[in-house]
Amino acid sequence: MNNSVTRLLFKRLLTLQLCHHFDIIPHRDQSFDCVQMQQPQNETANNFIPSIQLLWSTDPPQIRPDGTYPQAVELFPCFKDKWNTKEEILNIILAANADPKSNCVTVQSSPRPCSSSQFIYPRLDNAWYKNDGYIWKKRTNGKQNREDHLNLKISGHPHISAKYIHSAIVPTFHRRSYSVPDSDCHVLVHYLNVKTNNKIDDQAEEIARSMIENKVFISLSQLHDQLSPIFLQTLNVNQLVAEINEHLKKKGVNLPTSPLPQEPSSSTSRELERRNSCSSAFRKGLSSVALRRQPSANSEIDANHIGTMLKRFGCNGSSSDRISIIQPTMQNFQSIRSHQNHVAMESRSPSGDGDSRPITFEEDASYQQLSIKSSTNVSTPASAFAEKMKIRSGSQESPMGPPSSSSVTSTSLIPIIEMTPSSSSLKGGQKMLVVGGYYRKGHEYKISFGRGRMMPAVLIHAGVLSCVIPPSAKPEVVQIRVFCNGQAISTASEFTYEPQSAHLIKENDDTLVQIFEKIRIMACAFNAYSSIENIQSSSCMESLLANIVQQIDNEVSSQNLNYKTELLNGSAHFPSKTVLHLVASLDYDRLFEALIDLSRKVPACREFDIFARDNDGSTPLHTACKNSASRIARLIISIDSSAIDVVDDRGRTPVEVAPEHSIDMLSDKNNEEERVNATELWVMTNGKAFTTDKILDGKISRAPIAEKPDDLLREATSSYSIMSEMYEGPMLQAGTSRECDEDCESCCDPDSTQQLHVEIAMDTDVHVPDSPKMARLFHAVTSPGIVVPPNARARMADLARQIIEALPDRIKRNSEVSMCPDEEDPGQNHHGGVEPMFYQQASCSMSTDSPNMMDDYFDMMATETRNDIFTEPRSTETTETSASKSAQLFATHCNFFDDRSFASSSTRANTFESDTLDFDKDLGEFFTIHVDRFVDPIQQRLANLKYNDDEQRDVYEAAMVIQRAYRVYRARSTTRRQEDIERRAALKIQGCYRRYKQFCYFKKLHNAAIVVQKHFRMRKRDDKEEGAVEAVIASVPEHPTLDGQSICIQVPKTNSTMLRERAATTIQVAYRYRHRKRQAAARKIQNFMRQNRNNVNIDDGHTQHLIAENACAKRRRYVACPQTSGDQRNKRDSDGERKRDAHHDAPEFIPIGATPSSTTIPHRPTQRHHPWDQLKPPYGCGTLA
């Protein structure tokens, strides 16, 4: 009684649960044999229990003691000519999960399964079953198969994950894979050709169209192998292939009759080319069997392998030999499956569809890779499950097919023959070479250093990989492996991270002690010594030192304390390493940031100056690059990008002192085509180096300690602004890069922007590259097909405005007269918004690249008067007053511009690049300068670069076109004709701008030569002890001498092999002669100028004159001053006696005929320090920056 009640309750509960979750309606063609089962004890992960039991044709429907099954038993059909319903799919997968030992579960994949066949595969560790030998549609990148992912819902809940893939040859042939996400143990795979068109001609035309669209061009034999399993029972495959070939020939595609070499059945020839270069590695989405070959080896493919295999079990493709497959009969299916399992080769391959989980190192170590060495056309998929069991059992045999099939041998992974170096320090950064069986390029190689450290590798030679050794946190021995396209292809090799040597540890400890001492001195200078009390130098770490600096910063901010400058600036005569140098050597980025934050409250402090130099002339960036401190290097470059162009005493930039491949951003900077040359940098800055006023902003430049007179400050700012504009390189910002506007994103991308190469006709062999900002601007306004963003238009209009203001008035008047003919058409008076200056005669001279620019622009604008919102009345004044009217008209239109875009000519900060050129001064000089061609070679080059009147008129007209375009672009949509005219005008302005930059270059070169010559004369005067001052000056040669020969600054003529760098090198050699170290020379010049600052009396018999050295104007002059007695000077100076003693130490400045005891020392009228006194070595005049 109890047993019957229990069985009845179980039936009702099971029925209610199945009906609640999904309504199971058995189809008419399904047969269910009901047997009495035990009550299930376990349920699946999604609380479902299978409603059927899957049995193979040879399995009797009996109860197994090791499994729990429902009450229904179903024979799993291997072939089904329609898609399964969602309920059927769920039942099949759950039944397979409940009984994984069932014979319905297949552990071997079949090559090119026939249409209507379905399989149940175990997932194992990857989607290995997807390598079935068919050619499927690819993604847009052409590398991976395209899969459509869907979630099938049952009763409103997504319980089935489906993946659909479509054939690239037969558009009606598909493969569908189903799995249950909550219980991802088995997968149901179904192949089906949903449309069977019996007309061969229509089917052939459809297949030919699909092959052309998917770019599948294979041989006729391979096409026959692809179509045979799909149209096994419906069409004559031989006739179908012939029809397809005819359709392809009509469309201009000829398929090869012989099989393409090195082409497996599961991929095209292009895929195999990429595939074979991996040696024994397999690429995602390609065949599971790796083709291992040497560079000189060629593998041929047997095109008839599949045909031979099909003939063995009766599938030869002919209509007379077709096999009639009957659905209830299972013996034929079993024989086909057994034969497929027999000929399948063992291998393991991950799926290339992107849905497989990554392979761990342990799994890769437990598997081996098979390769084909003989001539085989088909890389048949293999049984991953059987291979896994075989390899774990230690067996080395591979089940083979008939002797006529391919010969397959099992080999291990590619061994690493040698690697150098085999050990490294904890810092890493060295280049390592790995030698092995890696031959061809075009693949993504990576080398793993233990777990979680993958470094990209480059194939620099056949069999040689190169990568950078990553840093390590502790000394250890790690396993190194080579990966190709994400798959391990080599055996493991040991690599050792060695601990630091004793002397390196000692050096680091000494550096830490020095940093602590520096911070202690800083605390004393800021009267914040309480922050470092009870702290020992032996316990200093980066975090502790950073906290100390932050405490000092907080105390300075809260109390606003005065600090002692002498403790922070150190000695100017003996430059040493600053705290930034020491921190950069250890790569303490947190401490470096804390010091930079503190420097914002301490202006003009050498300890916090990123341009400060040590005794070798190295900046903190040099030190960071030498020690591979990448974090500090990125931080310094983000603060001020010009630090990468500073050179040390040996003329080396930070890029040149950095180890190879240690810092990527510096290597990229070094590999640029247009890079700063150390000699050119020194010449362009007149031997000066400048730091920044606001370190974190890095925008406003200033001289180091430039005080009055204002001329020196103006000259220094102008010189540095030229350098910052001309040589500002694209740095690699670490998370601080400035984003462009949405409209300008495409044209302002530093990765996609390239410099425009527009030929400029000029008589010079000097090329000054565009800065990145100007290159991006010109690229945005001159490239066809790119929408010009508003900010680029504003900047271009600003440049055009400055050019117009710099041009002489006579050029403007002549251009206005030429653009305003006397006899005008009365109908043209009503062209709204077109100024008189835009009219142009046909005889107006225009450049060859912009003919009739103004006429085209006027015609174009006249047709768009309806959209023009700028209506200006026609000028009725005479041609004599046209200049004033034009200025008024220009000022009227300038009111429309934004305040940020336009400013007065005297406001430099509001220009489109605040740190670029001094356009107001230099452009006017460029257009109006009068040079003598017979003075010297540099003057000749300046004369050649100067624009003549006709060229200046062309530039003026182009600038007016840009001005007009900017005023009206917001109110109308630009046309193609308008864009062409604006582009030609922008090219004209670009040529003018580039020639102007070359003009500035030669001008600075000339000024640098003058500076060197003047300094040489100063030194020559000090060495002369006899003769009057006039005689001394007269005796100084015009040019410095080297080895008894006069050195003259010369620039080669056109077509000469000597370039500008040799001229600058000549300047350096002349200046640095007889001085090994630059600091010593700078100190001597400073002492000389400091001593000559005091006035010296010279008695010429009548009056007394004073000779004063004016370092700013770089010239000597005589200044008459009233005679002052020594007693009066002593009364005004309480410390006169000490000053007289100090001046007696410089006998070379005592006039001839006077004695030290009788010479009266002049009094310094003011306490204002001369600007040269504040220049620290190597910032002296004429030093090499």
Swiss-Prot record:
Residues 1128-1147 have a biased composition (Basic and acidic residues). ANK repeats lie at residues 616-646. Transmembrane segments: none annotated. This is Calmodulin-binding transcription activator homolog 1. Residues 418-498 form the IPT/TIG domain. PROSITE patterns: ANK_REP_REGION, CG_1, IQ. The keyword Thylakoid does not apply. It is found in: Nucleus. May interact with calmodulin. The lineage of its organism: Eukaryota, Metazoa, Ecdysozoa, Nematoda, Chromadorea. Belongs to the CAMTA family. It holds the Pfam family CG-1. Residues 393-411 have a biased composition (Low complexity). The keyword Nucleus applies. Residues 957-984 form the IQ domain. One of its GO terms (cellular component) is nucleus. It comes from Caenorhabditis elegans. One of its GO terms (biological process) is positive regulation of transcription by RNA polymerase II. Residues 252-277, 390-411, 1121-1185 are annotated as: Disordered.
